[in-house]
Amino acid sequence: MTCFNRKEKTVKSLNGLIQGNPEIQFSFVVADDGSTDGTSEALQEFAGVTIVSGDGNLFYSGGMRLAIAKAKESIESYDYCLLFNDDVDFYPLAIEKLCKKENGIIWVGPTSDEKGQLSYGGVRKISSWRPKTEIIMADSKEGTACDTFNANCVLIPWETFIKLDNIDPVYTHSMGDFDYGYSASRSGAVIKVSDQFVGVCPDNPVSVSWRNIELSRKERLRRKENPKGLPGKEWFHYLKKNYNVLTAIIYSAIPYMRIIMKK
């Protein structure tokens, strides 16, 4: 897990996992990206937490890379590695239920928004050449196969986790989890999404993103190139790696066209 200045959410998330899954013995690796709100001090109150510190410039992908690298240094062997976000309000027994599903598979735990609608989960490609995907959850206990995932809650068998490469260093914030999942699929790992929500995690509103057409072109461009937006170099790399060069050339230009045309 990675965190930055969300002490209450971070503490609540860890407490939810520990208290809600009494049959599981957790060991946490948390990348704290230079929080100034007492997050690091609060984390030290938990048993079994290893903290790796950043300087405030890690963002999501950088923080997760640091945490994953630290976890792989462990001399102990675990059953699973759980990737999760600290803004997930986990339901009781959510992770225990995932652990009881089919072995040897990467299981994605879908989340809902506050209205009970799917917010994050498994991700399936709609096209082999267009970067169009859909977020899905299963409709049966057997789960549904997917191509990648939102890493808000992902349970990876330890042996699989150790073999996987870390998150690509090109990514600062967004796209890192999608790319990580695609890499896992290419390595031969099977990814399935569960049929039960593991908790609540509202998705990010369009109003704060570069896609908000009410913003000026200048502001939209600034937000797009921000690490939390869709930086051009990272987006091109993502498209080339997970689709092809032609797709990367065409679709890396489209966001700029949308901004110019106010769409």
Residue ranges and their predicted role:
Residues 54-73:
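Glycine-rich, basic loop-to-helix element that forms the pyrophosphate-binding segment
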Residues 149, 154-165, 170-197:
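A short, conserved alpha-helix in the catalytic core of glycosyltransferases
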Residues 135-156, 222-223:
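A recurrent flexible, glycine/aromatic-enriched loop bordering the glycosyltransferase active site
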Residues 89-124:
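Conserved donor NDP-sugar-binding/catalytic core segment of glycosyltransferases
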Residues 76-89:
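Short beta-strand-to-loop acidic/aromatic patch adjacent to the donor-nucleotide binding site
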Residues 15-25:
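Short, acidic, metal-binding catalytic loop of nucleotide-sugar glycosyltransferases
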Residues 206-263:
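Non-catalytic, C-terminal membrane-associated alpha-helical segments of glycosyltransferases
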Residues 16, 32-41:
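A conserved acidic beta->alpha catalytic loop
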